[in-house]
Amino acid sequence: TATLPNYKSKYKQPAKMVPIYYMDTLAGVNFNPTDYVDITEEIDLKLQMLNCHESQVVWMRDHDGIDFADMVKTIWKYRGYQCGVAYAEAFRQCQVYLKGTTKRLLP
């Protein structure tokens, strides 16, 4: 509602425009990150949670012959190499007027 001044909401307006970050593509294709988040300590939990999506994991394996967990772990490792940690997720900040900041926002 911050950009819709004629819309009345029961919620408070944010202090300013909220920055937007795009997440890495599934296989890292055509994605140039601006920010990385070290996920080394969380890698096992993230993979465990990912494998809870049985319908997607099984479908990708049966339909495309893709081990989904192995694929994302590989891209996380690659992104980790790029920023000097074991595993990382990559993001790209949306660079538009009023969305920039002078401080780091991601963990």
Which residues make up each language-model segment?
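Metal-dependent de-N-acetylase/amidase catalytic core
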Residues: T1-P107
